Amino acid sequence: MESPAFSKPLKDKTIKKALLGVLGILLVTGGLAHKDSPHLIYNLTWEVTNGEQETVWAVTGNHPLWTWWPDLTPDLCMLALHGPTHWGLDNRPPYSSPPGPPCCSGDKGAVSGCARDCDEPLTSYSPRCNTAWNRMKLAQVTHAPKEGFYVCPGSHRPRWARSCGGPEAYYCASWGCETTGRAAWKPTSSWDYITVSNNLSSPQAPKACKNNGWCNPLVVRFTGPGKRATSWTTGHEWGLRLYISGHDPGLTFGIRLRITDLGPRVPIGPNPVLSDQRPPSRPVPARPPPPSNSTPTGDPLTPPTGDPLTPTKPPQAGTGDRLLNLVQGAYLALNMTNPTKTQECWLCLVSEPPYYEGVAVLGDYTKHETAPTNCSSRAQHKLTLSEVTGQGKCLGAVPKTHQALCNHTEPTVSGSNYLVAPEGTLWACSTGLTPCLSTTVLNLTTDYCVLVELWPKVTYHPSEYVYTQFEPGVRFRREPVSLTLALLLGGLTMGGIAARVGTGTTALVATQQFQQLQAAMHNDLKAVEESITNLERSLTSLSEVVLQNRRGLDLLFLKEGGLCAALKEECCFYADHTGLVRDSMAKLRERLNQRQKLFESGQGWFEGLFNRSPWFTTLISTIMGPLIVLLLILLFGPCILNRLVQFVKDRISVVQALILTQQYHQLKSIDPEEVESRE
């Protein structure tokens, strides 16, 4: 700030500021709009920049987003690199070593190549960082009781602070703009994002200066509002000015967060959503035995045409291989644990979400102080489980609507640790699936998680049920209860059902069948998540944006190829003890033909007549009704007609009698004896 003609008393710099309302900063995404799990580990780099937006200091760590708030300790002179000319470092690039020559101690000749005596007084016209002597005097200023420095916010300041100016005034054009620093009046703020102070005590700084090093380190700490802000990826700026007599020199600096581990970007081009729809690969034929090492005389060995040292990347599995591997893995796991159910059955893939379901289990997780490798892997964080059964271990603030899934709820774990789920399990959180949890995220958010086993939504049907669905005239009174793979195998990794089927937990997890199912689920989940990502970034028609259509297209692709039989909304594969049958549609036709022949062989000639002549059945059912009605009329019609005629005659006679009665009067009868007696 420009100094007035008279001296600046301390009270001029302690003007009371107007009361400010606390700004509520919402937990929304600023510079980065991410939809991944909050527990996902990223490579985070906090950078301190100079006025030219060049990075002069940085610190890197692997942590979840918005959970790592380290102390930033750049040197004050580092902020002046490529800065204003009065700092003396305008021609030195970032990350330059401290310029010399060193500072003399008492006698100028005591240090070889020294420039000035360390005890000479500092003037306001001297550069601040270009020599060891200037850096030592700068340390004296920043630690002096009546001097120091103050910091003013730039880009994120409120509207009333427009009078604070811009970068040309280091955002400190008027008093009251300062929010932090190391000054006598102790500037503070309830809304600024950082606090700035010295990182070395007054006795420590001169020693570092005399050794020709950076000796004015600052310590920048994030405040509560700063930790709630999520706009650090775009960066924020501040201005810093020294509080000395005369003109207050200053500079500007910025702080930003760089996130370098966001995964690959999808270029604009052909939509890759449906590019992997390929038929299943044919089984590899058995290779012939290798020829003997002996070669005919004079016949030199032919060198191989290909380079055996060149690694070949295996092609990505298409729709056919991916879904068939998923059903094959389900069959192997079911056949190993319960062989009686795989004598003859149908395993069906559903076309409607959810495609996976979870079984809550109890297990012991492992706690790590540093992020393990699987915590930084981009697991299925876009996928959520809408169907979870059972009771298991829960973490976080579980709402009442989901407490039925918790057999044991652990309180919130303090500290900054990483909780890794046991092998074969995942954490099903309100934000998605993840193999690793961050206790910092659980403490800062309302996220909650349940330890679950993940099983594909594969429906088990007995063969009799499937055949009757394709046979005409056979209907169940009610729909049978569908058994899924989760109900048949749920809890195996934690030993829940394994003890009942006589299979140890360790043995099951280590078996090749279970590993094959886990690998198939991982590949399918990866494909589904990639489909979601591609659909989110797709620039084509909106008809591709429905995930259900994607899985429906996959199953339709298998159905049209004859690989599965369509049963309602499911795509079913036939399986028995010989294994999974790929040509399931042909197998279904074969089984239906066998059942039809067996049914016909047990029928009589009359029943067979109806089966062999479908038109006869239609004709009889059409004319049978009218014939029966006509026969009834011929049998009972005359009798009914006679009774009706007799009834009509009787009624007519009664009417005639009534009419005659009304026309004539009845004469009174006279007894002759009574007449004679009167006379």
UniProtKB/Swiss-Prot annotation:
It comes from the Eukaryota. Coiled coil: none annotated. Pfam families: TLV_coat. PANTHER family: BC035947 PROTEIN-RELATED, VIRAL ENVELOPE PROTEIN. Residues 268-321 are annotated as: Disordered. This is Retrovirus-related Env polyprotein from Fv-4 locus. Residues 280-293, 301-314 have a biased composition (Pro residues).
